[in-house]
């Protein structure tokens, strides 16, 4: 009998509510016979916040933690000041669930036009540290709104936090082309950069099959547009990863075909998977949104649970659909049906 996995579903806002059901359908079809899924839906996002002021109530977060994984649609609404939902929902889940790896695959599919003149074979993944660095909230300000105001943001890097994400990157590289590129700015950020490099060198000794090199962040941004095929696994910190993942999404044709995962690799808490596109309120409710990225997030969820063959069914179906019909204008439902029909 197939094991049943509990999945927390947060459709969120805008087109998130339209594309998430297709991720669920892809999960079920790809894993048919090997895994079953039990869903718990959570009404979290802009509408909930505007209705009763709640972002992530404690009891609901507790129920989310009891699941095996999380499927997220999209969060954001122009009626709400930027940052409120992102900090109160997405970042809170990331930190409370210790999702210390932000995983962002970037692949240029046949049938998708890259903005690069000669993109080559683009297929790499960014492994971004997700709970430390400049985004952990250390810092402050004094003498606000005066000429003497002082503001600080402190980048926190711990050996423990760095080593666990480095190990994740090398383990992932073993399943791919066996190459890791550390991206940092160690010539200027000498303390954090030196620690990152030493830990990469140490862990690298345990993976003799995996080669590794280093690039400064400025050089890496250049190579992402001049020679992206050189990369396999890009390993970097929170801030640099935030920059690189956006650029990576652009070189493969935009956010419509990109998914991401916020991973707790210890499985102490559930990991979260989502398309990287936003809530797109301008087309919400019109059956226009492309569900491909959401469906790819379902493949990432399956890979995380250990169902690589099931995930491959989704990847194969998506690649075939994009190659044949990627330039065809289709509705949300039609794209979803076309992809599922190939599985």
Swiss-Prot record:
The record marks 135, 185 as: Important for catalysis. Keywords: Amino-acid biosynthesis, Branched-chain amino acid biosynthesis, Cytoplasm, Leucine biosynthesis, Magnesium, Manganese, Metal-binding, NAD, Oxidoreductase. Its EC number is 1.1.1.85. Pfam families: Iso_dh (PF00180). SMART domains: Iso_dh. NAD(+) binds at residues 278-290. Catalyzes the oxidation of 3-carboxy-2-hydroxy-4-methylpentanoate (3-isopropylmalate) to 3-carboxy-4-methyl-2-oxopentanoate. The product decarboxylates to 4-methyl-2 oxopentanoate. This is 3-isopropylmalate dehydrogenase. It comes from Bifidobacterium longum subsp. infantis (strain ATCC 15697 / DSM 20088 / JCM 1222 / NCTC 11817 / S12).
């Amino acid at each position: 009998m197939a094991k049943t996995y509990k999945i927390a579903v947060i459709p969120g806002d805008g087109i998130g509510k339209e594309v998430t059901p297709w991720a669920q359908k892809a999960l079920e079809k790809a894993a048919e016979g090997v895994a079953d899924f039990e869903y718990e839906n959570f009404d979290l996002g802009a509408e909930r916040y505007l209705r009763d002021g709640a972002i992530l109530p404690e009891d609901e977060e507790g129920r989310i933690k009891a699941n095996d994984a999380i499927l997220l649609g999209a969060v954001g609404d122009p009626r709400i000041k930027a940052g409120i939902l992102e900090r109160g929902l997405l970042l809170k889940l990331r930190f409370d669930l210790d999702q210390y790896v932000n995983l962002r695959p970037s692949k240029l599919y046949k049938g998708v036009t890259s903005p690069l003149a000669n993109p080559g074979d683009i297929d790499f993944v960014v492994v971004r540290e997700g709970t430390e660095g400049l985004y952990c909230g250390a810092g402050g300000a004094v003498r606000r709104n005066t000429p003497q105001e002082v503001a600080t943001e402190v980048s926190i890097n711990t050996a423990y936090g760095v080593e666990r994400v480095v190990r994740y990157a090398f383990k992932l590289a073993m399943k791919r082309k066996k190459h890791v590129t550390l991206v940092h700015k160690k010539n200027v950020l000498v303390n954090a950069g030196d620690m990152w490099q030493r830990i990469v060198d140490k862990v690298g000794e345990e993976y003799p099959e995996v080669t590794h090199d280093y690039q400064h962040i400025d050089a890496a941004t250049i190579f992402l547009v001049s020679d992206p095929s050189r990369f396999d696994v890009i390993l970097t910190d929170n801030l640099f990863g935030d920059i690189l993942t956006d650029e990576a999404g652009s070189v493969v044709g935009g956010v419509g075909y990109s998914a991401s995962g916020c991973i707790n690799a210890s499985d102490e808490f559930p990991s979260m998977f989502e398309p990287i596109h936003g809530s797109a309120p301008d087309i919400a409710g019109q059956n226009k949104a492309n569900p491909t990225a959401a469906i790819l997030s379902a493949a990432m969820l399956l890979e995380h649970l250990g169902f690589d063959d099931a995930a491959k069914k989704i990847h194969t179906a998506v690649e075939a659909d994009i190659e044949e019909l990627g330039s065809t204008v289709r509705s949300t439902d039609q794209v979803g049906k076309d992809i599922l029909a190939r599985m």
